[in-house]
């Protein structure tokens, strides 16, 4: 009885190690492919240029902000400049 329990536990242990190794091999191939995917997505987002920086967006001067927004001097973000109109 004890021998059959030990054999069963040993077989389960071997199966667990085998399944874990297969999973790590799959996950490893995903990780090797992901940097190229991330770089391609980075290129896509960098190619899009916005016309102006929207409300609370980062800026360095007023001309970067959308109409009726100005660049704040302290934290350098676009905020309403107090004007109305189209």
From Swiss-Prot:
Transmembrane feature ranges: none
Signal peptide residues on this chain, from the entry's feature table: 1-21
Tissue: Expressed by the venom gland.
Pfam families from the UniProt entry: Toxin_12
Positions of disulphide bridges: 52-66, 59-71, 65-78
Keyword Ligase: no
SUPFAM superfamilies, sorted: omega toxin-like (SSF57059)
Subcellular location(s) of the protein: Secreted
Keywords, in A-Z order: Amidation, Disulfide bond, Ion channel impairing toxin, Knottin, Secreted, Signal, Toxin
GO MF, one example: ion channel inhibitor activity
Source organism, top-level taxon: Eukaryota
Positions where Phenylalanine amide occurs in the chain: 84
Function: Inhibits both peak current and fast inactivation of voltage-gated sodium channels (Nav) channels. Inhibits the inactivation of Nav on DRG neurons (EC(50)=1.77 uM) and peak current of cardiac myocytes (IC(50)=0.90 uM).
Family: Belongs to the neurotoxin 10 (Hwtx-1) family. 37 (Jztx-31) subfamily.
Protein name: Mu-theraphotoxin-Cg2a 2
